[in-house]
């Protein structure tokens, strides 16, 4: 059996913080796997990049009968099992180096349950769907095209779940707030668990050059009396603040209009 080869990422997927104009996007991984070949793609909803491939020498079936065929077939199954296990181990190693949020499997559906059996628990928890695709011949554009419906379905579900929590949370004594002023205030208090944003939402605001407090009104910071500085888009600064506090940021695309009714920005609170 050949030693699998792994390509390294050729584009800039690094750990640097996003520029203020960039909005966070969930990281996706697509694993294509056949009985003898595997390919790994990583990226986001807009673009995937092939980052690894694995090829193992798995013998093909033959038509001879008797004990010889049985032994040969058992050998093939063992080689396939080793290939799947090796692929899952390498995928998990990559995940540890460059984590992603969701995983999609692609290839023959009959291998899916075998792959799931060998996936690390952390990867199983991120598995959201399967696509039928030619593992060895598919272009990166086709992989993205097949994966996109799964990605969009996952986004719709997460947005629906967040909206349900928001609706429940904005009741009296609930754990959610809506509107830019309220959200910025709760960000300053570090009480936000999830920041919800309508795609494309921008708004002007103010920031404190000393403590970083964000607001939409005032001339001086209520915390340290520093003169507030105007910001063309305070929403980007809110996103940066959220990421610095390890807050989940969810961009609404499919249900954007529903969040726009709440001022295009909301927050689910820790307490």
Model-assigned labels for residue ranges:
Residues 1-271:
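Terminal alpha-helical anchor/extension segments at protein ends
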């Amino acid at each position: 059996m050949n030693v699998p080869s792994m390509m390294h990422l050729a584009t800039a997927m690094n750990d640097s913080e996003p520029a203020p104009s960039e909005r966070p996007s969930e990281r996706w991984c697509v694993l294509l796997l056949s009985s003898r070949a595997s390919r790994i793609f990583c990226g986001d909803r807009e673009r995937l990049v092939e980052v690894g491939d694995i090829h193992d020498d798995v013998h093909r079936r033959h038509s001879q009968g008797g004990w010889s065929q049985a032994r040969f077939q058992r050998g093939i199954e063992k080689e396939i099992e080793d290939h799947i296990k090796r692929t899952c181990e390498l995928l998990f190693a990559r995940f540890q180096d460059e984590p992603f949020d969701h995983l999609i499997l692609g290839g023959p559906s009959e291998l899916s349950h075998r792959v799931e059996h060998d996936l690390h628990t952390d990867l199983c928890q991120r598995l959201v769907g399967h696509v039928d695709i030619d593992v060895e011949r598919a272009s990166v554009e086709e992989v993205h095209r097949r994966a996109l419906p799964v990605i969009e379905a996952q986004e719709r579900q997460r947005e629906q779940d967040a909206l349900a929590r928001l609706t429940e949370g904005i009741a009296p004594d609930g754990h959610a707030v809506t509107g830019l002023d309220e959200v910025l205030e709760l960000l300053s208090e570090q009480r936000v668990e999830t920041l919800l944003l309508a795609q494309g939402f921008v708004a002007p605001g103010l920031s404190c050059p000393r403590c970083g407090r964000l607001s939409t009104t005032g001339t001086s910071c209520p915390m340290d009396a520093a003169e507030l500085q105007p910001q063309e888009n305070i929403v980007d600064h809110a996103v940066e603040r959220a990421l610095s506090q390890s807050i989940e940021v969810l961009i609404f695309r499919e249900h954007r209009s529903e969040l726009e009714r709440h001022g295009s920005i909301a927050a689910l609170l820790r307490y």
